[in-house]
Amino acid sequence: MKLALSFSLLACLGVATGTPISSGAEFAEKEFDYIVVGGGLAGLVVASRLSENSKMRVGVIEAGRFFEDDPLINTPAAVRNRFLQMNATYDWRLSSAPQKHLNNRVIPLPRGKALGGSSAISLLIFNRGSKNEYDAWERLGNHGWNWGGLLPFMKKAERFESVEPIRAAVELGEIPADQGTGGLIAGSYNTFYYEPVFPYRAAAIKAGIPPNYDPDSGVNHGVQNAATSTNRTTGLRSYAANTYYRSAAHRSNLVVLTEAQATKIELEQTKEGLTAKGVSFVHHNKTFTAKAKKEVILSAGTLLTPQLLELSGIGNGEVLKKHGIAPKLELSGVGENYQDHILVSTTYEVKPGVSTYDSINWNATAAAQAQAQYDSKRDGPLTASNSLLSYIDLYHIAGSAKIGYMHRKLWEEVAKEKPTALQKEQYKIQELWLRKKMGNVEVILHPGYFGAGPAKNNTSYISIIMCIQHPFSRGNIHLNSSNPLAPPTIDPNYLSKTIDQQILVESVKFADKIAKTNPLAPMLVTRQDPSPDVKSDEDLNTWVRDNIRTLHHPIGTAAMAPKSLGGVVDEKLKVHGTTNLRVVDASIIPMHLATHLQRTIYGIAEKAAEIIKNDY
């Protein structure tokens, strides 16, 4: 379907009119105090905050373009049609190495290649993890990185203006105190819901998932109607480029260069230690170097930050030498500790007449009506995102005996390996989480088809997506070549721990339990994925291996942890062994969380900006 969008209303937003510059030579000639590598979610937050001081000159190097008036980015529901992810115009189009535990399948790994980064192409869910999960970061040796230390910065980034409708319906009062109301990113709730959404919620509760009316409080266990990053006044996606960048673009001390790829952090050994002096980058096939007087801040993301560190001589010396790069700083944790949320999606055909998102795809009349409603009222189906989700513990999906077997199998496998010091500490924490009422599995209702395909013509579906939140499998990212423009080798090592597969198998069974529960069951015809004849554990194991995908939440490849544990950055986000090189993106997250990541990363970036300001 064609998504049209008039942007005349942008004049009403009160935003600045500055735009990125288009000359690499001009950028390189400027003098900067700070250079931010990567104009994604975190990078734009940091650049915006640092440039609040008019005496500080801030440069941003971004590989993508600024898609200011692009309806595929700005219209919330457009992302469901998968026009953005793995589209080379907007996406790096990265992929995993063949996964040996997935029958050598190669898994697509979308990452936003645009000003705003992945906040420009994400599915917009705007939620938080639990207090226990954030507190675990501090348990790993990162003082001040806990729920209490991060919550004020998450709130600083966000602006809620309305109460979640289900919460309001049970008369639980005003906007919760744990939600921010003065920030730039609009947190809001869908005003349009497809027909199966509320019957699904009732079925999930009957299946044993408790309702949660305050999931932002630090306890996110239960079924909830999550917020999305959507501006309900304009009907537009609210993301880093049209908020943080737009609010700061008029500043003469903030300079953003787009379509430029950083190739190396220029490092020198000084009397203070290894010091970042600038950044080399390629812009329209020419190489330039820009200099930074104070700091270089690396915000290239989980998949590309470790590559740039290694290209600059920071990492495992053996990896660097293999590609002819002289080691400048031995830091074996670079590129390690890769963690991701992996999922399988069960799909169910719904009865004729039941409205889901699929009808917009195959029903021209429904598509035209949705577009007309969006154009006239900035409301309706085109503003709706997936929001009905649950975080559940293992006891929802498996009995005590089966969970006990999972534990024993896990420790048998760990005993045969040589886990890193960081992994040993992580596994101790994760093992405790398996026994707690915590979100070990996320259950997402997608009111449409989200299977491996193909869907039947002129047919509507719902999908129940089951996603592991605390995987035990660990992967890595390292150089594939000394060519800085070549992608790195990304090996997530999915299902290298049997427990991850066991959890997904039991999760499929639980999805079926919800689907067979009233009042949802009467709306469904049959299960399509996996096919109804897939019943035994053996068959389910095969299906899981063949159908695993990722929810696109990679973290951990420049982990914040003490160097003795294999960490890459310290609690001030400085790379161990350097004087002024910091990392600010999801790669610093040491352990995964039961949440979608954008809200946490906004908080990390706000906290990082405060740390940097306080150092000068």
What are these regions (language model features)?
Residues 2-616:
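N-terminal redox-cofactor-binding region of secreted/periplasmic oxidoreductases
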